[in-house]
Curated annotation (Swiss-Prot):
Signal peptide annotation: none
Main location: cytoplasm
PANTHER family assigned to the protein according to its UniProt record, in alphabetical order: UVRABC SYSTEM PROTEIN B (PTHR24029:SF0)
GO terms, molecular function: ATP binding; ATP hydrolysis activity; DNA binding; excinuclease ABC activity; helicase activity
Localization terms from the record: Cytoplasm
GO CC field: cytoplasm; excinuclease repair complex
Gene Ontology biological-process entries: nucleotide-excision repair; SOS response
Name of this protein: UvrABC system protein B
Subunit structure: Forms a heterotetramer with UvrA during the search for lesions. Interacts with UvrC in an incision complex.
Spans through the membrane: none
Annotated positions binding ATP: G38, A39, T40, G41, T42, G43, K44, T45
Domain observations: The beta-hairpin motif is involved in DNA binding.
Amino acid sequence: MSEFQLVSSYQPTGDQPKAIAGLVKSILEGHRFQTLLGATGTGKTFTIAHTIQQVGRPTLVMAPNKTLAAQLCNELRELFPYNAVEYFISYYDYYQPEAYVPSTDTYIAKSSSINDEIDMLRHSATRSLFERRDVIVVASVSCIYGLGMPEEYLKASIPFQVGQEINQREVLRDLAGIQYERNDLELARGRFRVKGDVLEIVPAYEDRVIRIEFFGDEIEAIRLIDPVTGEILTSLSALRVYPARHFVTPEAQLQQAILNIEQELEEQLAFFRKQGKLLEAQRLEQRTRYDLEMLREVGYCNGIENYSRHLTGRKEGEPPACLVDYFKANDWLLVVDESHVTVPQIRGMYNGDRARKQVLVDHGFRLPSALDNRPLKAEEFWAKVHQCVFVSATPGNWELEQSGAQFETVVENGKTLKFYVPGTGRVIEQVIRPTGVVDPEVHVRPTAGQVEDLLGEIYLRLERSQQGLPERVIVTTLTKRMAEDLTEYLQERGIRVRYLHSEISSIERIEILQDFREGAFDVLVGVNLLREGLDLPEVSLVAILDADKEGFLRAERSLIQMIGRAARNVRGTVVMYADTLTGSMARAIAETQRRREIQLQYNRQHNITPKPIIKKNSNAILSFLAISRKLNSQDLEKAFPVADEIPLSEIPELIGQLELKMKAAAKNLEFEEAAQLRDQIKKLRQRLLGHHQST
């Protein structure tokens, strides 16, 4: 019997029961891959939750980014309040990787800011995987990066049991050995203190205090304590304290690793000297010998992860352990959400990491073994996966092929294209929405006079909005310039309109979408509006300009995703402006019409009247916006020549904006710009710190 307890006031409806039954049957029959092809707004998460509950295995849910991972985690926690639903994403608030730019001879040291709360959640996830089966871990793709070996992590943990005879001094030494720090004045995560016969520990995986009471060398009681009030929350008969860090290296293994690092260093120095690269040899020897001395003296050094191959005893090229290895082999389930985005990310992680590190190795900043501190290659990751469910409204061909789907081939413009044949393989379709809302009608109109035609459609929605439920409009263009010109044209005609483009920061993007939902404006114009956060039930019209211009933004899957933006509204309509009907357009329209007919037939058979979706605005987004920026990008550029004149009250917000720009630069591999922004942030923080110290 499954240990998962799903709690909901709703029952599966529409074709959710059929989808749940299909997925569960396929998984229990032992099939490795299956796909849930669910249209927008059909309740895919609810279906997956029921599937997890019926299969009853520990589950890893992978999302393409932190935002969607957080959203999924919250939804699953509501559905499984009595089970362990954990959150595992990168614990860096900011991460500037170590890099070298040969063209300018610029070395940029690693710089990062670790979020302590997220680190706690990561430890909580691995602890749950060791101690229970009813676990769902929601993770971003960063979970395929190296993590400490689960065997060493578990072996290093310390068990405590009431009545156990144990030497206090040995316990304190063991705690220090697994990276806990003694601090008798202030308890915090990863610390412990001793007062007489009482040992208090704040573990890495939660914020409650573990109090162990001794009578001599015998454990008399184990209690969990509220860290603020000191109130006893519960008493336990036994528990296990896990290491404060995921990377744990026993002393004997550390000494062997040091010998191996020294041997590799000598080999690489000989290689550089033979090539006449004396500068690189000197640089490598100086840096590595310093790191070796730190490892001998304190067991740690900056950039220790670059020696992870030696510290974990792996062979050259062998994949590192990651979160997947904390699941028991062949006894867990993988769910890949938005698989059309997530699967390509898994493929791309290794190559980007390798290119940067290879430059460091070639120029003597790192030993070649640093290349093995890396994310998994795609083939390595999939080799670890026993069973998987792909989830998407537009799954990629690779996912469909793995799920046994059949394809038909079509030759277009000299290219041979493959297209999925509906109803084949282990592809479970879910097209009926619980609300009864059907896919939108799709109209194709000529480009001549398209702007005037669009204006008329917008006026129609504005008029209807004044008479009943609000309606909004999304317009997608091919270029940023076209989006700007169209926005200006609509503004001149009294339309409340904004546009989105790639240069808008994440915070400002959220702010614009929030204003859109609240009715601060009625029309949103943009180029790539396929990203998350645009599933707005108020959108009743999606207009696609230049729909016949083939390319990524007008490919079949992109068009279906855009059509889906109007699929949550009872009056949903899509207008494609085009002079020719491309293959992508024809297939997207045909697929939408196919789903629409299924939905209409279901509504007729069950006498269902479509109901509009009423969504509450997210308080989390609003509170996020409350600390949003006041200064625009031009102000930021001008801020530093007159930094001393910036009011102290505005510095925290300015730092926040610079951190966003710094993260964006690091993500785009613009290391020099990121380093400059980092230095600017340091100056501002020093000014704030100086002010606080003087007061």
